[in-house]
């Protein structure tokens, strides 16, 4: 069990992910989300589209914050083959953790 009374604010950040999930998010929204994740020392920064993976990987380079791409977001209605391709592409572009939306 974790004794929260003995944790610093910096250490506590690792208990949380930070995410920007709206499909209408802009590059500025994603970059700002990365800055917030760094400010609070989050475990991961998650986003709704693999499209943002290279930008997030660039923003988080040199940190231990995980690059969290969503696969099949938001409804998981894609076929397994499409999700497999999306997974491979996200990892190739720099994702270090994946959030797979099941159907």
Label each PLM-derived region with a short phrase.
Residues 2-45, 52-103:
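Alpha/beta enzyme core
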